[in-house]
Each structure stands twice: as C-alpha cells, then as structure tokens.
Amino acid sequence: MIGQRDTVNGAHFGFTDRWGGVSAVPYEELNLGGAVGDDPGAVTANRELAAKSLGVDPARVVWMNQVHGADVAVVDAPWGDRPVPRVDAVVTAERGLALAVLTADCVPVLLADPVSGVAAAAHAGRPGLVAGVVPAAVRAMAELGADPARIVARTGPAVCGRCYEVPEEMRAEVAAVEPAAYAETGWGTPALDVSAGVHAQLERLGVHDRAQSPVCTRESADHFSYRRDRTTGRLAGYVWLD
C-alpha cells in the first residue's frame, strides 16, 4: 500500500503502490484517482485506507484537479464543498494538513520546510516541467516563509528516461527548456527523463536535500502506468508536517 515513506525533522513523505485497495480490474487495487472511470465508492474507500495507513485523517487531505499546467493554489484547509481547482501544485503553511498529488508516470514532487512549516505537492509531467510548475511551487513556498536551503524534496515513482520514448522534435523542445531531461531509451530512440529535469530545477532553485525514487512505473508491476496500460489507476504522493 505505502511503497515508500520517509520522515525528516517532522516532515512526512509517503508514496503509494497499487496494492491493498478495493478497486477491480483494470484499476486493481489501490486506485486513488477519481477521474479515471473507477467506481467512486472504491476510490473513496481507497483514499481512506491509504490515509489511515499513513496515520493521516482522510478528511485532512487536499487533492487537486490536475491539468498539466503550472498554476499553484495556497490552501489552509481541504476544499470541502467547494469545487476543486484546476492546479498542478498546492502549498500550505498549515501543519497537519496533508497535500496529495496523483500520478501514473508523471513525477510526484513533495516539498517541505520543517522550520517554517510550509509544504507543497506538485504534479510534474512533461508539460508541467516545461511550464515551470516546480519553480512556481517553490516560489509560493518562499512567499509563505520557506527557505529553499531548508526545503526537503522527495520525488516518487515515475516513468524513467529509459522508457519514456518521445518523438525527436519533442525531446528537442523539452531539452531546450531543461537540458537535464534529454534522454535515450534502452533501445536507442529519443526519450525524456522528467525526474532528472525536476531535480535539475530544484538544484538551481537552491533545494539541495533531495531524494528520488528508484522505481520506474512503466517497468514496475507494482505501480500504475498510463504509458504501459492506458486505462489504469493512479498512485498518490502525500506530504505533511507535524
């Protein structure tokens, strides 16, 4: 259920795998995405299971309506009955409020400054990397008092550069913005390494305490992958501060 987790000075990070939930094929088992065609009741149950496994109150988790952009929402509570905004990063200065990001190949980016009590979760796919969602999230954190030098960053399971095949023109366009994303597949064709691009951006922003998951979602049967399966579930990354 919780494939990876880490705690640093009261900052908590967790990434799910696909097991331990109640969703049926092709979303088996722990699908946390509410917009992929799965039974809404199963998604709600899965979100409760994952939150409780992490020791988080399911009612204190903030989700996003992710659209592959660079918009950021600053939050101090869950959305409740309000519409969930179309953003790809959420930032909070509310300790104990968990932020969640959904992925199935894109890079889940979790950030926290334990001193200021500011945290962020961002969804960085190819478009978001180019649009600058990660710098936007770090800037929003800084506006709330975070210091990039204190930020702890964790990126979760994502499709790797050996597997993320793209047309040559697309690789060139992305590499023109972020050279670190330039990659080649294991079979010698153009590819992108979005995780490498994210970490390069974080380094330039002054975020040095970083760790990257070794898991490639396309290669791992324990994780959802849109590129591999198309119709499938979504993983989640969670971050919160004591």
Swiss-Prot record:
It catalyses: adenosine + phosphate = alpha-D-ribose 1-phosphate + adenine; S-methyl-5'-thioadenosine + phosphate = 5-(methylsulfanyl)-alpha-D-ribose 1-phosphate + adenine; inosine + phosphate = alpha-D-ribose 1-phosphate + hypoxanthine; adenosine + H2O + H(+) = inosine + NH4(+). Zn(2+) binds at H68, C106, H123. Its cofactor is Cu(2+); Zn(2+). Coiled coil: none annotated. Its EC number is 2.4.2.1, 3.5.4.4, 2.4.2.28. The keyword Hydrolase applies. Keywords: Copper, Hydrolase, Metal-binding, Oxidoreductase, Transferase, Zinc. GO terms for molecular function: adenosine deaminase activity; copper ion binding; oxidoreductase activity; S-methyl-5-thioadenosine phosphorylase activity. Homodimer. Purine nucleoside enzyme that catalyzes the phosphorolysis of adenosine and inosine nucleosides, yielding D-ribose 1-phosphate and the respective free bases, adenine and hypoxanthine. Also catalyzes the phosphorolysis of S-methyl-5'-thioadenosine into adenine and S-methyl-5-thio-alpha-D-ribose 1-phosphate. Also has adenosine deaminase activity. Belongs to the purine nucleoside phosphorylase YfiH/LACC1 family. This is Purine nucleoside phosphorylase SCO2081. It comes from Streptomyces coelicolor (strain ATCC BAA-471 / A3(2) / M145). The lineage of its organism: Bacteria, Bacillati, Actinomycetota, Actinomycetes, Kitasatosporales.
